[in-house]
């Protein structure tokens, strides 16, 4: 995977939380750790699922922001490339050797369009989403300037209420413009229903996706009638991939969180009413935290607070234990309820974050652990790449 192996000059506890070969107990906290066995099982499972259903899987890099994790998804899970949300994020992956990059977002600022149009010079195939005909003209001009080619996905707003057009006529108009524009290629449709990914009920998610799939089918039919059949119809996430893959319309999935999982995704249910983190996917990402104070007999204070995680989707839970509970946090402190006084100062706990994506974005490194030993230390390659 071309993972970093030379850590000479790195000081543990200042530059980096751990080094390969260390015991898990020696890792400096708070930091992100990956259970490599669970991660690899998740990646293989999604790859096997996509293959069995005749689908491409393009893993979403906005979740992990790591070139090394993406390469693992490609080598173990057959991922065909990476999805990104920002130009700088796409640059981090392309510069890191990822050869197929889709920006699942609109790029409108002239300077960003210029950078996007230069990106194929790294050797990567680059595709971007569009929801406005004027954007086609700007992208074409920049690609001509740099002598590059860009792929175009027309984005449909199929319920997220964000970017994307809402009518089949608008889809056809933009696709025609892309097909006619120099240095651009119309490749397909982006149709991701983000608003329903975290709905607890399987039936509620299915109802939202049924409506989205019907909308996308109308657009596909309209394109085919104009001789513009899309090569790819792309979308789907960890909370919905089974709907898109059985739709007969989509042929590419964009799942991301399945690889790591988080507390919020764990709360949603499958068709049998089971949590999807109990059999479908495993928790592979944890915030490793240490007890720093136990001055009160029923409360332990740990070193993972707001600056170590995102709590927009709720507080983390303590993994593998029901005798202690993470109950509140401030900038640098987390408070763990310890009714029986079982914790001691310097004990380490694994926390499952409420929301993996923004939690990963506040850390510099992933520490990969197997059988209690540090095996890998990977940089969060696109950390802070929000431009």
From Swiss-Prot:
<dbReference type="GO" id="GO:0036088">
    <property type="term" value="P:D-serine catabolic process"/>
</dbReference>
<dbReference type="InterPro" id="IPR042208">
    <property type="entry name" value="D-ser_dehydrat-like_sf"/>
</dbReference>
<feature type="binding site">
    <location>
        <begin position="256"/>
        <end position="257"/>
    </location>
    <ligand>
        <name>pyridoxal 5'-phosphate</name>
    </ligand>
</feature>
<dbReference type="GO" id="GO:0008721">
    <property type="term" value="F:D-serine ammonia-lyase activity"/>
</dbReference>
<feature type="binding site">
    <location>
        <position position="265"/>
    </location>
    <ligand>
        <name>pyridoxal 5'-phosphate</name>
    </ligand>
</feature>
<dbReference type="GO" id="GO:0009436">
    <property type="term" value="P:glyoxylate catabolic process"/>
</dbReference>
<dbReference type="InterPro" id="IPR029066">
    <property type="entry name" value="PLP-binding_barrel"/>
</dbReference>
<keyword id="KW-0663">Pyridoxal phosphate</keyword>
<keyword id="KW-0479">Metal-binding</keyword>
<dbReference type="InterPro" id="IPR026956">
    <property type="entry name" value="D-ser_dehydrat-like_dom"/>
</dbReference>
<feature type="binding site">
    <location>
        <position position="355"/>
    </location>
    <ligand>
        <name>Mg(2+)</name>
    </ligand>
</feature>
<dbReference type="GO" id="GO:0016833">
    <property type="term" value="F:oxo-acid-lyase activity"/>
</dbReference>
<protein>
    <recommendedName>
        <fullName>3-hydroxy-D-aspartate aldolase</fullName>
        <ecNumber>4.1.3.41</ecNumber>
    </recommendedName>
</protein>
<dbReference type="GO" id="GO:0046296">
    <property type="term" value="P:glycolate catabolic process"/>
</dbReference>
<comment type="function">
    <text>Catalyzes the condensation of glyoxylate and glycine into (2R,3S)-beta-hydroxyaspartate ((3S)-3-hydroxy-D-aspartate). Is essential for the growth of P.denitrificans in the presence of glycolate and glyoxylate since it functions in glyoxylate assimilation via the beta-hydroxyaspartate cycle (BHAC). Is also able to catalyze the reverse reaction in vitro, i.e. the cleavage of (3S)-3-hydroxy-D-aspartate, and that of D-threonine to a lesser extent.</text>
</comment>
<dbReference type="InterPro" id="IPR001608">
    <property type="entry name" value="Ala_racemase_N"/>
</dbReference>
<feature type="modified residue" description="N6-(pyridoxal phosphate)lysine">
    <location>
        <position position="62"/>
    </location>
</feature>
<feature type="binding site">
    <location>
        <position position="85"/>
    </location>
    <ligand>
        <name>pyridoxal 5'-phosphate</name>
    </ligand>
</feature>
<dbReference type="InterPro" id="IPR051466">
    <property type="entry name" value="D-amino_acid_metab_enzyme"/>
</dbReference>
<comment type="similarity">
    <text>Belongs to the DSD1 family.</text>
</comment>
<comment type="subunit">
    <text>Homodimer.</text>
</comment>
<keyword id="KW-0456">Lyase</keyword>
<dbReference type="Pfam" id="PF14031">
    <property type="entry name" value="D-ser_dehydrat"/>
</dbReference>
<dbReference type="Pfam" id="PF01168">
    <property type="entry name" value="Ala_racemase_N"/>
</dbReference>
<dbReference type="GO" id="GO:0000287">
    <property type="term" value="F:magnesium ion binding"/>
</dbReference>
<dbReference type="InterPro" id="IPR054854">
    <property type="entry name" value="HdxyAspAldBhcC"/>
</dbReference>
<feature type="binding site">
    <location>
        <position position="238"/>
    </location>
    <ligand>
        <name>pyridoxal 5'-phosphate</name>
    </ligand>
</feature>
<dbReference type="GO" id="GO:0030170">
    <property type="term" value="F:pyridoxal phosphate binding"/>
</dbReference>
<keyword id="KW-0460">Magnesium</keyword>
<feature type="binding site">
    <location>
        <position position="357"/>
    </location>
    <ligand>
        <name>Mg(2+)</name>
    </ligand>
</feature>
